[in-house]
Regions:
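Conserved phosphotransfer microenvironments
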Residues: 22, 43-46, 58-78, 95
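Short hydrophobic/Thr-rich beta-strand motif most characteristic of the beta2 strand and flanking loop
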Residues: 34-44, 49
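Two-component signal transduction core modules
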Residues: 60, 87, 110-111
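As written
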Residues: 102-108
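C-terminal output helix
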Residues: 115-124, 128
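Conserved phosphoryl-transfer motifs of two-component systems
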Residues: 108-111, 126, 131
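Conserved acidic segment of CheY-like receiver
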Residues: 8-20, 25-29, 60
């Protein structure tokens, strides 16, 4: 298995998340050497930004909005179009009913709201190196 030896080798994208908390976490991740290719406000915009890239991110961190009835269909579309991207959910819900659909879509991990930049860094390293985090 090829493991990532340096965080400078990692590029990510944030989808469906433009919060001030993610602003702070993004700055910390940049300080860790992780390159953030883009941040989008919703999944549709994220799909559009992904299609414009020459090099895809290794990881997409997606804030889950379960109030959007189309969220699971949009996530399935994302997985289908970009099967090589590692997907990490960012959610305030850790109930089985929320996590089970993510497993069915083949998400690689889940971080709860309140996770700090170090938690994000560890999750990114885990999924890049073939692990899963739930």
């Amino acid at each position: 298995m090829n493991t990532v030896k340096s965080l400078q080798e990692i590029n990510i994208a944030f989808i469906n998340d433009k919060s001030p908390i993610i602003d702070l976490i993004s700055n910390d991740l940049l300080n860790f050497g992780i390159d953030i290719l883009f941040r989008s406000e919703n999944t549709k915009d994220g799909l559009s930004q992904l299609s414009a890239l020459k090099e895809l991110p290794k990881v997409c961190i997606i804030d889950l909005d379960f109030y959007d009835k189309n969220v699971l269909a949009q996530l399935q579309e994302l997985r289908t179009q970009y099967p090589t991207i590692k997907l990490i959910a960012h959610s305030d819900i850790d109930a089985e009913k929320a996590v089970k659909p993510l497993l069915e879509i083949s998400f690689d991990g889940c971080l709860l709201i309140g996770s700090d930049a170090d938690d994000f860094r560890k999750a990114i390293e885990t999924v890049i190196n073939g692990g899963r985090l739930f």
